Amino acid sequence: MARRPDLQSGPERLAALVRSSIPPMHSAGLPFVGASLAVALLGRKRRWMRRAGLISAGANAAFFRHPPRVPPTRPGVVVAPADGLICLLGEATPPAELGLPDIPMQRVSIFLSVLDAHVQRAPIGGEVVAVRHRPGRFHSAELEAASEDNERNSVVIRTPEGLHIIAVQIAGLIARRIVCDVHVGDKLSIGDTYGLIRYGSRLDTYFPADARVLVSHGQRTLAGETVLAELA
């Protein structure tokens, strides 16, 4: 009979500790880390070039980190789609390009700095019924006008109860590339990874006006874990 690896000591234990301490990286970061390592390799005889390449590789690996998260199991909750800081709370109409009724919904806006993990997660489980990209400007994502003026990508998720929850990826001053990996008809579970925005951005989450908001301005959020609201 094969011997079971001893995870209490030895190399298996060390490998397990490394895996638990260092979060994995989203696949979108591989080209950036690879290019940085190539610079370090090509410039290995020049100290400054080698150091710059290694620093860039480390920074990109940190930016594209994809930490594991444990979503809540209780039904009827909306979780944060992104790590970051809540910068806006209130009612607003959903993006016009979605063609939804012009009725105000609750909106929670999360600002992501370059130090936050930029992987986005589904705020609720359900079916993707719309994905719309709209070109725009690249103003600071902290500004309220960014919801209207900046480039954005909207994903509408319909819950089994027929409610629409909207997650809007908004490009920022530095962020110039929105990545969305879901399509109409896809089924998502709460907390599933569905995209990212490169280098600083914002996420707006829209949900029904009668939902009970559970977060406050200035609060930090963890994607897939922090509960933004309870649905009525």
Swiss-Prot record:
Family assignment from sequence similarity: Belongs to the phosphatidylserine decarboxylase family. PSD-A subfamily.
Keywords: Cell membrane, Decarboxylase, Lipid biosynthesis, Lipid metabolism, Lyase, Membrane, Phospholipid biosynthesis, Phospholipid metabolism, Pyruvate, Zymogen
GO cellular component terms, semicolon-separated: plasma membrane
Protein source organism: Mycolicibacterium smegmatis (strain ATCC 700084 / mc(2)155) (Mycobacterium smegmatis)
Name of this chain's protein: Phosphatidylserine decarboxylase proenzyme
Pfam families given in the database record: PS_Dcarbxylase
Pyruvic acid (Ser) found at: 201
Subunit and partners: Heterodimer of a large membrane-associated beta subunit and a small pyruvoyl-containing alpha subunit.
Cellular localisation: Cell membrane
